[in-house]
């Protein structure tokens, strides 16, 4: 399956996968307004055997088939303070 990947100019590390280049007809308007003007990053062939960066390839393919788009958001930031506290408890 071929798809287009766009990055958001408003939201860092946020990407929108759509089935066809420049076709945002199945993406809700509220999402598009939050996402901002999309900037094409790449056109790619999705292959379940080949992993993507953060997203699961099979999940992206499934979302494209069912809703026509997939939104990839960045993982939550690490809470380094909590990690440090947990390490201190373990070492005692």
UniProtKB/Swiss-Prot annotation:
Q: What is the top-level taxon of the source organism?
A: Bacteria
- Note the Pfam families from the entry: YcgL
Q: Which PROSITE patterns match?
A: YCGL
Gene3D superfamilies reported for this sequence: YcgL domain
Q: Where is the YcgL domain?
A: 1-85
Name assigned to this protein? YcgL domain-containing protein ASA_2166
